[in-house]
Amino acid sequence: MKIVYMHHAEREQNSHAAWGTPERTFDEITDLGRRQAELLAERLKNVRIKAIITSPYTRCRSTAEIINQYHHLDIAEDERFNESQKNEAWESLLKRNMAAIEDIVRQYADDDIIICVTSGVNISAFICYTYNITPSNDVPWTQAADLSPVIFTIKKAKDLL
């Protein structure tokens, strides 16, 4: 299967909200972010996407809905794809992300394409997992650009589990 980890579109930044606080969950995407997501939706309209899974954060959900305009799928929300919570350890973030990925691998077939709309820190966690980088608060977070896709292929559960 192909799992496409997708960073949400450009968002309105709430400069008064601290990282990992509930206020950050409501950041909406900008007009530019909407246009970015629309262009991506157009590009993906002929791709046979089996499922779209998103963080429930507003910016992620909005991005997923725009991508879904040609597919008309039920969008699933999974809190394990939320960004790091206030004072959350890197190990905890990685553990919940990988648990979500493992569930996806169990649920879908080898030829399925799954879109996961998430935040940049989750993409960083997956990159660390993939390249066997020990999770640590000292590992620098990668800065994912808006709508940065990370595509990986998994042959059912044997590759991951």
Segment roles from a protein language model:
Residues F81-S92:
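Short alpha-helix plus adjacent loop in nuclease-associated cores
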Residues T54-S55, K95, V117-T118:
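Short beta-strand scaffold positions
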